[in-house]
């Protein structure tokens, strides 16, 4: 009986996977679907061969709105009549995701929940009802909710009946990915387990939770997938850093990746993966262990928004993933996280309630146990070159301590509720309120400790970056002061200095992006400070670069290399600003006359060494000679001599060194608040732009607008007065002399006649006479 039922279930599941709504499109091998993974090109199902293909245009990535998803379905399936979209019930494994602008695609898979593109008129899914299972449905015509809402309704309904949700489908569409009901099948817990066990015994390649037809996790192959994914992600990071370090002889990059945490995370991930078997109990055990892990950022420095399952809250919560390492409690979306962890963890809690002596399924791992003074230990230890690794370990210890305390409180809460079953309602409410306050207190305490940890880490990183920049600047000036100066050495020192400034800017932007995602209000408050700091970095770089003018021979020899370095730095700044500052355009007045910034590039200009900075001094970097500085020919701006005022007008000659230059002249750029406020520094369309305000043209435009406004206002006032006067003017058809001695009735009749009134009696007799 059971093997036959297992085969029937397997056949039904296979038929369901290949089911396509009928709209005159017979013969399709697969259902139209699309899948998205942020940072990669979208994928869509090839309905002819059943394989996933990358975006045909090579440009489309994450889509935020359901309307956009529907439109994208219609674009990739133009021959089908796509009318709606709905999330799939289960996540799938997809390989060969492509990055935008790259020809070769990575082979490691990602787990995502695809969207089904519905063809033609909506037809509800045909659900298979196994033996001892019940088919149920709910419809509410006054409700129009998403797939996730109805999935939750179905799951809760089955849980109330002490059963497990076996399958479900949407009913009565009312919008894009919105429906008015759900149909579902509830099976007894033991029956569901037997069914899945039988199906797994027949089909070794099937996997309840990580199910993807393209991936085989039997015999430890899951380890290979995880390791390949992590190795390729680490390879990408190393490749990018290798590009940054190209031609850098002294290796000036800030190395913040710690191998020790990565190895530990890899070992922990591998140990979890190797326990996977083809039985449902083993799969659920692995899922419970995965979903009970604490969120780990990993040793890398990216800030990728991900989700993890929080066992204390019983729901998924966001966190930032570094890009490599970490563990498998790491999901792309909240829906995917709940789909994997929600059902198994709720079943575990139900079993725990029914069997008090059973092992606690959500018991936290004790590998990261910490002492109460874990944060204090980090705060008391001075920073060093391994600051990032120390910070990661301190953060993990803090999270472990917090989870231990929360787990203890939740166990106490559960025990208190069990003991309070026979108490009055008021006492039960008091118990609940007490533990809620305790949980909130622990959360607030943990948040404060996290904030203190992050602020300390930020301060140490800033101090380290400042030291590196100061050292690079001193080496650069020393190279310029050498007699005779060596052009190649000067260029290498200049490159190290530019990289140090670039690191400072990258750190500032990443911190701002983190604050903006966590606390948008605080991000709005510190935005002006961030922009001021970025402007200081640009001006400091410009001032340092201008020192090359004092050694014309060196400047001429390394001109091409410097141009290439600045172009690379400019492209990097454009990319970083476009990715990190994704906010609407902020206007500060005269930007309406500026050109479109889609074609505007941020240039690194040269500024005078002495004297005040002015907006007219900001010119693009061009080729220069030994005796003069070229002008910006496009805008016809006069050349700026970047040499000291005392040397302007004198003929420079090769070999004139900088023996009298002091480090203090350019080590720091001091800016008061008034100078910062009056600068022409703005952010437009995610790019950093310096521009010179044309004061004369702006005044003329303002005067013209004022005169035009006065004229228009005058015309409006005159028109209103005339209309009002006309409204209250009496209608006269002629002048009729009225005797003052007549009665009021006659006077009233006279006025009526003046306004066109005709006595019907008079009119009747006039007609009779005629």
From Swiss-Prot:
Cu(2+) 1 binds at residues 147, 151, 168. Zn(2+) 1 binds at residues 183, 186-187. Disulfide bonds join 38-62, 73-117, 98-105, 133-187, 144-174, 158-186, 291-341, 300-324, 316-337. Residues 28-123 are annotated as: GFLD subdomain. The chain crosses the membrane at residues 702-722. The keyword Secreted applies. The modification Phosphoserine is found at residues 198, 206, 441, 730. Residues 291-341 form the BPTI/Kunitz inhibitor domain. There is a cross-link at residue 763 (Glycyl lysine isopeptide (Lys-Gly) (interchain with G-Cter in ubiquitin)). Residues 523-540 are annotated as: Collagen-binding. The modification Phosphotyrosine is found at residues 497, 757. Residues 268-281 have a biased composition (Low complexity). Residues 723-770 are cytoplasmic. Residues 1-17 form the signal peptide. GO terms for biological process: adult locomotory behavior; apoptotic process; axo-dendritic transport; axon midline choice point recognition; axonogenesis; cell adhesion; central nervous system development; cognition. Residues 374-565 form the E2 domain. Residues 695-722 are annotated as: Interaction with PSEN1. The modification Phosphothreonine is found at residues 729, 743. Residues 194-207, 228-264 have a biased composition (Acidic residues). Chelation of metal ions, notably copper, iron and zinc, can induce histidine-bridging between amyloid-beta molecules resulting in amyloid-beta-metal aggregates. Extracellular zinc-binding increases binding of heparin to APP and inhibits collagen-binding. Belongs to the APP family. This is Amyloid-beta precursor protein. It comes from Pan troglodytes (Chimpanzee). The gene is APP.
